Swiss-Prot record:
GO terms for molecular function: N-acyl homoserine lactone synthase activity. This is Acyl-homoserine-lactone synthase. It comes from the Bacteria. It is an enzyme of class 2 (transferase). Required for the synthesis of a yet unknown N-aceyl-homoserine lactone (N-aceyl-HSL), an autoinducer molecule which binds to PhzR and thus regulates phenazine production. It comes from Pseudomonas chlororaphis.
Length: 196
């Protein structure tokens, strides 16, 4: 398994198709998220925040199939927290060049979750981020606690599509988080995919 960083402009058409299909498989087919269908690519999942401002972390297996992904966007550009989930923040959603949003985080293999998470933080920090924001459900919040991720809640727990969610903010620097207190591999496939 290896990971790569991409932007949409850098991706080949084949890789874009692979990523769109992987996200559709994970979020629409397996999790049942009610997301708008892509107008021209059936079976692919993209939204209005997939722009030239986004960076993507992709994890590949030995057969060059995508097994994990994450999307990173500076909050100075349109993002999911501001555009869709602004109500989850007690105040205005963060908007600063050093604060990035992480969304569409998912893995097919449980053991990839934390390696992909830490690599996503590193990618953002090297690009100038000091903090990461995003939406998690209560299960993912517990998983972050178990794996030593320090975060703060940006607002109260709310309900979206019959699921409890909340907005959080955390440091983009791994050294600000403690070591995991339990192996991350215990995590079920379902739990891994339950993030925005």
């Amino acid at each position: 398994m290896h990971m790569e960083e991409h932007t949409l402009n850098q991706m080949s058409d084949e890789l874009k198709l692979m990523l769109g299909r992987f996200r559709h498989e994970q979020f629409v087919e397996k999790l049942g998220w009610r997301l708008p269908a892509h107008p021209s690519q059936a079976g692919c999942e993209w939204d209005q925040y997939d722009t030239e401002h986004a960076r993507y972390l992709l994890a590949f297996n030995e057969d060059r199939a995508i097994v994990g992904c994450a999307r990173l966007i500076p909050t100075t550009f349109p993002n999911l927290l501001e555009g869709v989930f602004g109500h989850t923040c007690a105040g205005a959603p963060p908007k600063h060049p050093a604060i990035w949003e992480m969304t569409r985080f998912t893995t097919r293999e449980p053991q990839l979750a934390m390696p992909l998470f830490w690599r996503s933080l590193k990618t953002a920090s090297l690009a100038g981020a000091d903090a990461i924001v995003g939406i998690v459900n209560s299960t993912m919040e517990r998983y972050y606690k178990i794996n030593g991720v320090h975060y703060e809640r940006l607002g109260p727990v709310t309900v979206h599509q019959n699921e409890k969610i909340l907005a959080i903010k955390l440091s983009a620097h791994r050294e600000h988080h403690r070591s995991a207190v339990a192996p991350s591999a215990f995590m079920s496939d379902t739990l891994l995919r339950e993030t925005a």
